[in-house]
Amino acid sequence: MMPIKSIVTLDQLEDSEYLFRIVSTVLPHLCLDYKVCDQLKTTFVHPFDVFLNNSLGSVTKQDELQAAISKLGINYLIDTTSRELKLFNVTLNAGNIDIINTPINISSETNPIINTHSFYDLPPFTQHLLNIRLTDTEYRARFIGGYIKPDGSDSMDVLAEKKYPDLNFDNTYLFNILYKDVINAPIKEFKAKIVNGVLSRQDFDNLIGVRQYITAQDQPRFDNTYAIADAARHYGVNLNTLPLPNVDLTTMPTYKHLIMYEQYFVDDYDRVPIYYNGNRVIFDDEIINFCISMRYQSLIPRLVEFFPDIPVNNNIVLHTRDPQNAAVNVTVGLPNMQFVDINRNNKFFINFFNLLAKEQRSTAIKVTKSMFWDGMDYEEYKSKNLQDMMFINSTCYVFGLYNHNNTTYCSILSDIISAEKTPIRVCLLPRVVGGKTVTDLISETLKSISSMTIREFPKKDKSSIMHIGLSETGFMRFFQLLRLMADKPHETAIKEVVMAYVGIKLGDKGSPYYIRKESYQDFIYLLFASMGFKVTTRRSIMGSNNISIISIRPRVTKQYIVTTLMKTSCSKNEAEKLITSAFDLLNFMVSVSDFRDYQSYRQYRNYCPRYFYAGSPEGEETIICDSEPISILDRIDTRGIFSAYTINEMMDTDIFSPENKAFKNNLSRFIESGDITGEDIFCAMPYNILDRIITNAGTCTVSIGDMLDNITTQSDCNMTNEITDMINASLKNTISKDNNMLVSQALDSVANHSKQKIGDLRQSSCKMALLFKNLATSIYTIERIFNAKVGDDVKASMLEKYKVFTDISMSLYKDLIAMENLKAMLYIIRRSGCRIDDAQITTDDLVKSYSLIRPKILSMINYYNEMSRGYFEHMKKNLNMTDGDSVSFDDE
């Protein structure tokens, strides 16, 4: 027996191998009409991954992604300016995201359940986030992932040792930070954006505002770094005529630029002295505390909500020196004013005040519940049926949230259960293959299979012309001539082949020789190659068919042939005569590409990639697509079967290994193209998998009796679409697919069969009526010729027996039609992907079945009744009964 830990599970597989397992093992156990939850058709991708690769955002909810980008911008600014957080392992620069190799600040309260999953199929930042989520606390993972709590109560407040400021408003911080075209300055925190080759006006105004507080010695370096002179000329600003800076705190028009200096430039450029009422302020911390308190006065109460321990006073003491350099301590106190002490943590609190100011003038972000973060309640997850459980666990990474020591952690759900912990919520991350979520691919595949009609399975080629108008002798002569044509100019080769054909055709007699299918491709290649066309052949396996694609360049058309012949000194009339004489050949050449197999040209391109091009431009070519079913012996791994010595070895053998291997290769090509669809998977699916899906799919059950009970008959219901609506309505409780075409086909089949059987019933009735007619003739003869009287009771008995015969015949006919209708109903249910759960079909079901189909065959029933009534009345008249009203013919 294989150890349990050595079993390969779906979450350990990736790409084509994973998708193959899903299609071959999970898909056959799903109802063909299985409806995938819309919330599972999208997944979560970290915004950093989307910034690096826009295509990754196609599998996410756009509103959820935009909300995460806004939230992540806030969290990143909080993290990078904080002295203690440092949770992000990246640095955002202009146009790129650099990964920091130093360890991030992981909490001491690590997850007690060890994570053993790597998630290599995920993008790098999403993979890193999952590793953090399964290692550290859930709260920190949500901070790094840009989580926003949704509206409503169906979410979980996670427990954490320490929580960080939670701000939520719409913003473009990440876009501004990652803006590519900026001035390459030593100070990376301030992004001086270049717009149309010049410093943006907003940044120019801010830099001019900061420049006034920089010393004269450092201003040239500052101007050179940010190209201030060029921007000033562009905006028509004369730097020499700028007003002198106001450096007194009591008269400054705004504290914005002094705060910006402290936030970005304090470490690189010296600042001019700052005064308060004419006295120079000694300590820089007091200057920034005063400026922040004055500029963000209205936001101080909001700040205290997040940091209740921060010192807030009604006044501030400024240590200053007067013009004589004497120390003067000034206590500043203003009515209804508070002063905050940011404890020398200037950059963080300046940044945080800016965030609060932005929050005040912005709208909050509203999001819905996220299956990745919020998930569902564990009890709700356990209440799902087995089919949903199997689908979710096969197509998604399944996580669980649980509490341990007053802290919320996230782990793989199976690991939580193995560790005997109690999950609170279950979170899902749908997997992505080839640029689409697996859940969405399965939904599309089921839809493609479910909408397939009988004519499409197996799909057949359209017929094509298989002769060139020559007899077998003439064809063989022409074939030998083609083999001798070589190394001639294209125009000359076409003319010589056409003229050779015309010469053979003139003396040819006999019926056309039909080209054998096994020789068709060889003849096509030889014919067009001998005419100088560029012919390439590509072969592949698609589904359970060998696919051949012959490309002929340039494209073969009547006009092209005429033009080519005219280039070889033929007049237009001569060319037309040649074409008329060689009509069958040219008709064959032009029509070879008129038919298409069941795959589209785009899909053929994917299955049969081309690596070398020649001839006319792309698209100007004739494409011949040929499909041949693979023989059953070629589909089966006979070597593997016969090399197995034990039952276990035989069970482990993939019987349909050849076509399954081709299926995997096709899946790999689709995944590499990044444009895979459910229709592609369906068309590439081999018959051994498709047969299992058609046969086994559908775990939902339908009761014939219940369904017939739900169908309400109508007296005027004599149209197919009305019956269709009733059947669809009765099936809606179990399946959701629209079966209009399926029901119409089935009921029309019953109606046609009923018409055939009414003919049989009429013939048998006529034969039996002849017997009664002979009996009536005998009675007539006895009474008329022999003058013997036959009693009315004898005559009435004979007529009653005829009525019994017609009733029995009609009853048998009704039972036959009821059974045919039940067969149609079973066909509808089976084709809808469901199975029957009735133990047996009762006589009541037959009555209900007949009542359903009766409106469609009412005219035939009336015809039979009128025919039987006519026979009855004719016999009754000939019998000349004394009491004619003693017996009558009553139909239903």
From Swiss-Prot:
Residues 616-698 form a propeptide. Core protein 4a is the most abundant virion protein. Major component of the virion core that undergoes proteolytic processing during the immature virion (IV) to mature virion (MV) transition. The gene is OPG136. Belongs to the orthopxvirus protein OPG136 family. GO terms for molecular function: structural molecule activity. The precursor is cleaved by OPG083 to give rise to the 62 kDa mature protein during virion maturation. Proteolytic cleavage of major core proteins OPG136, OPG129, and OPG098, which occurs at a late stage of core formation, is required for production of infectious mature virions (MV). This is Major core protein OPG136 precursor. Interacts with P39/A4.
